[in-house]
């Protein structure tokens, strides 16, 4: 079957999906292998749009469902071109031709089981959600740590300001007490002597020295 040929009428057929194919496996090779179990209506190998190489899986259509089941039981785990095949029932119908799919809406993926973009999108969404949650958690943690550091710096600045004010108040009180003691000492030094000392000085001044005999004779004459 050549690439780009429009698909045949596959209504009423049973499709098998064959995984783990090599890039050199051709539709004719698959047809010869699967025709041993019944009449094969169609063999389709999806290829890359740009490189035209096989994507590693194929779909084999049988006219009879029982032949498809026999082929699945026999070929699942068989080795073809050095690869162990995985054969299962296909879930979806065959997609339309690529020429028509460009104009219309995107078709369903031919076959099932983890090869389409739809099967990968939930995983990507889960990953993006987990990444967004981890980012939000890291942001909240960073904000919490920032607020903690800010509160610590504020408390430290407050404690340092309190200690500085306490030191200043202590220095002021010590300077005031020193000035008071100095003023008291000066006032004590400048204060007059006591009354007893004054009386003794006045008595000593009032007492005159004793007169000589010459002075006494002059007075008597």
Curated annotation (Swiss-Prot):
Keywords: Acetylation, mRNA processing, mRNA splicing, Nucleus, Phosphoprotein, RNA-binding. Transmembrane segments: none annotated. Residues 92-221 are annotated as: Disordered. This is Serine/arginine-rich splicing factor 2. Extensively phosphorylated on serine residues in the RS domain. Phosphorylated by SRPK2 and this causes its redistribution from the nuclear speckle to nucleoplasm and controls cell fate decision in response to cisplatin treatment. KAT5/TIP60 inhibits its phosphorylation by preventing SRPK2 nuclear translocation. It comes from Sus scrofa. InterPro entries: Nucleotide-bd_a/b_plait_sf, RBD_domain_sf, RNA-bind/splicing_reg, RRM_dom, RRM_dom_euk. The modification Phosphothreonine is found at residues 22, 25. It comes from the Eukaryota. GO terms for cellular component: cytosol; nuclear speck. The modification Phosphoserine is found at residues 2, 26, 189, 191, 204, 206, 208, 212, 220. Its main location: nucleus. One of its GO terms (molecular function) is RNA binding. The lineage of its organism: Eukaryota, Metazoa, Chordata, Craniata, Vertebrata. Belongs to the splicing factor SR family. The gene is SRSF2. It holds the Pfam family RRM_1. It is found in: Nucleus; Nucleus, Nucleoplasm; Nucleus speckle. The modification N-acetylserine is found at residue 2. The keyword Nucleus applies. The modification N6-acetyllysine is found at residue 52. Necessary for the splicing of pre-mRNA. It is required for formation of the earliest ATP-dependent splicing complex and interacts with spliceosomal components bound to both the 5'- and 3'-splice sites during spliceosome assembly. It also is required for ATP-dependent interactions of both U1 and U2 snRNPs with pre-mRNA. Interacts with other spliceosomal components, via the RS domains, to form a bridge between the 5'- and 3'-splice site binding components, U1 snRNP and U2AF. Binds to purine-rich RNA sequences, either 5'-AGSAGAGTA-3' (S=C or G) or 5'-GTTCGAGTA-3'. Residues 14-92 form the RRM domain.
